[in-house]
Design a protein with these regions (language model features):
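Sec-dependent N-terminal signal peptides
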Residues: 7-15
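Hydrophobic small-molecule pocket/channel-lining residues, especially in calycin-type beta-barrels
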Residues: 2-6, 18-277
């Protein structure tokens, strides 16, 4: 019995020592205070640092077609019209609030949007996974590191790189397209305003084959300290858009298909009990 007790005490001591070591390793005071609810500040379109998106001629034509489609009431290839996730970097630009949770190995960004989007930013020093070992996702795979820029022993900036992104995606609701080759790389610097700690910035630079050169954009959010409210929203509850073939249609309140633009051809309804209108 004494031997068993000794083993148990030793195991407990080891567990407590490990817990204490982890707690010591994660010194919360070293990290910026990014707790709370953050809400976007400014217009929904990207605030470009170095001018409009430098699209290649091919993808400028795609963008022009998206804009024309949206002018006529269509979705302009914006994925959220079809209940698909916004993906990176559009998910960092939406109107719904976000929350940042910092842990020693992972920083989570939780976004209170359709189907509750989230990001995992690994800060444990890992390498990139082989492309064959990782399925592309809309949020991509993000690796980051905390940086002490002013040398005061505290972290100021979270530097992030994101790869392995799934298509289709657009930069924002204006329909600026990404290349569909899955080779997009996104680099970010996330940091608090030095003068106002209730303001946070996300400097984003995108490397993409739809661009003639990297494109830098800046986003700003403010901490909601008064009465932060969170909601859960399921896309299927509010979705009024369906895609049949390559064409989108609205769903009316009584379940009928409606056109999304003038003179739109009706879909093939031979298998449905609905007449063409």
């Amino acid at each position: 019995m004494g031997y068993r007790s000794s083993i148990g005490v030793t195991a407990l001591a080891a567990a407590l020592a490990m817990t204490f070591a982890v707690a010591q390793a994660f010194d919360d005071a070293k990290y910026p205070d990014m707790k709370g609810q953050w809400n976007r500040v400014g217009p929904p379109n990207w605030q470009a640092v170095n001018g409009p998106a430098p699209l290649t001629p091919e993808y400028q034509a795609v963008y022009n077609a998206n804009r024309a489609d949206m002018t006529n009431g269509g979705p302009g290839d914006v994925p959220s019209w079809y209940c698909l996730p916004q993906g990176m970097p559009m998910m960092m630009n939406i109107y719904d609030p976000m929350e940042i949770v910092i842990t020693p190995d992972i920083t989570y960004i939780l976004i209170s949007h359709v189907n509750d989007s989230y990001r995992r930013i690994y800060t444990d020093g890992r390498d990139w996974p082989a492309e064959d070992d990782y399925e592309l996702t809309y949020a991509g795979y993000s690796i980051g590191k905390w940086v002490d820029e002013d040398g005061d022993g505290k972290y100021d900036v979270l530097e992030v790189e994101t790869r392995l992104l799934k298509s289709p995606r657009t930069y924002d609701a204006s329909g600026i397209p990404f290349h569909k080759d899955g080779k997009t790389v996104i680099k970010e610097r996330i940091y608090l305003d030095k003068a106002d700690k209730n303001v946070i910035y996300d400097d984003i630079t995108v490397f993409d084959n739809a661009l003639t050169k990297p494109w830098s954009i800046k986003k700003k959010a403010a901490r909601n300290a008064k009465r932060p409210l969170w909601r859960t929203e399921a896309c299927a509850e509010d979705n009024a858009m369906v895609k049949i073939g390559n064409d989108p249609y609205f769903l009316s309140a009584d379940g009928k298909l409606m056109p999304t633009r003038p003179n739109q051809e009706p879909p093939d309804l031979r298998y449905f009990n609905q007449s063409k209108k």
